[in-house]
Amino acid sequence: MKIRKPVVGKMVVTAVIVIVAVAVYAVWGSRRSERVHVREMALAENPGLKGILELYQEDSLKYEAALFLIDNMAYYQGADSGELESMYKAYDIFSTGRYTYRQALDSAERLCGKPKNVQQIRWKADVDMEPGFLVSNIEWAFKVWREQPWGKNVSFEQFCEYILPYRIGNEELVPWREKLYYQFMPIIEKYKNDPQIENPTFAAHIVLDSLLRAPFHFTGEMATSVRIGPRIADWRGGSCLDLCDMLVYIYRALGIPCGIEELPMRGNNNAPHYWNFLVDQHGQTWYFSMFYWWHRLLKAEVYDDVYGKVFRQRFSLNRAMTDSLQLPLDSVHPVFRYPFFEDVTRLYATDKAFTLSVGKRHLVRHVKRGEVVYICMSDRYAWKPVGWTRYDGSNAVFKDCHGGTIYCLAVYDAAHDKLDPVSSPFSVGKENGKMEFYEAREETEDVVLLSKFGMLGEFFLGRMVNGVFEGSNSPSFKQKDTLLLIREIPGRLCTMVKTDSSKAYRYVRYYGPAGGYGNISEAGFYSSANDTVPLAGKVLGPEDGAAGDHSYFNVFDGHTDTSYDYPFADGGWAGLDLGERKHIGKIVYTPRNRDNFVRKGDLYELWVCREGKWRPFARQTATSDSLLFKGVPKHALLLLRDLSRGEAERLFEYKDGKQVYW
């Protein structure tokens, strides 16, 4: 029986696993029969795998370990050798720390050609691997498990899932255990006489601590459909998923059980997120990551984020989930068709992992009794499934859902490969689990919009709080008056404030607060509140803030997408010599920002969600830093698109005259 040629596609949870074999059954059958069937297919495709089972006939644990890998390898494939040269070169260049990822990508393309996309890459099924590769992997995995002092506190089940696997995703298959073992084992050897070394969390801590003491480079721009593989341990740079992969390779090479947790969709952003985890001998889950550089290992229950669902990636197929679905494979949404993950939301949310029940009265279309319904999270104007249940005829009940985010229910239309919403979207309170449905009403209102994305990640804005605008008649500002003290985080692109100073000043400036790095994008000083043209003068600032792309000259260049970033946390300022004394009647300032505020001249489109489906409402070109849309349905979720630039946008509600982002 020959296993089908790999089908190239991206699995949502592991982000890159592609299914190799699966002419298994038209309907998921029993757990044992599926496993045996896949095993027989793999052994028939690669007779050399039978030799591995014969080799370990007398070693029951190695025999079971070999079976564990064989029973799951038919679901995996990796990039063939030589297919990823350009991508590897981009990571290599980026790892130097001298270039942005975009610059590294451009350089790699000039040197190696354009990177191949996932459809262009040649794939190699794992069932076709050389038996010797698998034997070497098993031997090295057992070596570290049995030799490391903490190995006795790692169960065989944990060993199989989080030490033994020869790959993480769909990376090119290359040997890695021996190299990484000798490269990083010196970290462990320094603590070989420490009694705590028998605790796997202690071993994980000291390795992480050592790794965090050396430079590494993060970027949110790296998002490939192919995992980088063990080379990431040397390159030490990339996305949060790349950095997670790095720790998995290093930890498993040393015999430390380690895996990856995933937010399939962040509760307040349109992206997944990843971090590492370890389960100790007492069953306690600890989380950590190179991305979380400010701490080491922390207990799962203190994780603080808006996450909806947390999935634990695993090497083995979650057969308990496939058994419970009992559906034709093509009728299952791709996220859950081959689940190489398990839901561990409750480990993180504890008593804030709520059971949500959506009754028939909240459904917007007929759902058949027994039909599979998916609970989904927002991804711009689409929905991404993160859980499923069967509708019992009265309610759709979903367990272990974290709050602080928006959900919507949907069914999967297999014929058209799309989700059909069956409820209006609803929010869930983070602390109490209270549900509120957003159903567009006939009653309308006018809305004033200032941005298209929430303040998530806009830490620059807070750096203006306690900053001051000052006037002086001394070039050194030895004697100065405060014209304006910023007391709260700016909420729009251009904030205008009238000043009531009766004095005139030759020198004016913005002086950033302690820890603010002088961050500001634009500052304008006006003689009167009615003036529309700011005063001009010679730009001033500290000598060490004059160079680079973020110098103080940006503060007066008229562009809100450039900014000042002083090289030191304190002492940053930017000002003007007006040439003569002038009254200051108004100040307009723009915080350093990520360009998600409304910008004059850009074309925007407002979308409204009705019964779970997003529809365009109206378009408008901004004539200032705000937009006024009239006749918008009340109590509807909204989304603002900038058709002129950028991709960051997030759904929000309009409440008490303000945008409230979810």
Language-model segments: which ranges?
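Short, acidic Ser/Thr/Gly-rich low-complexity loop/linker segments typical of extracellular
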Residues: R380-N395, A618-A622
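Secondary-structure boundary elements
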Residues: R35, E40, E58-W235
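Structural motif
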Residues: D343-R346, T355-R369, M455-L461, N593
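Short Pro-Gly-centered beta-turn/loop motif in secreted/extracellular proteins
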Residues: S394-C408, Y412-H416, S502, G631-K634
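Short amphipathic beta-strand segments in non-cytosolic proteins
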Residues: R369-W388, F469-K480, L484-L485, R594, ...
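Extracellular beta-sheet/turn segments enriched in Thr/Pro/Gly and aliphatic residues
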Residues: V335-L347, P421-V448, Q659-W662
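Hydrophobic/aromatic-rich core segments of domains that either
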Residues: S30-L43, Y56, K190-V207, L211, ...
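Disordered, acidic Ser/Thr/Pro-rich linker "stalks" and the adjacent N-terminal cap
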Residues: A440-T495, T499-A504, G515-K586, T590-K600, ...
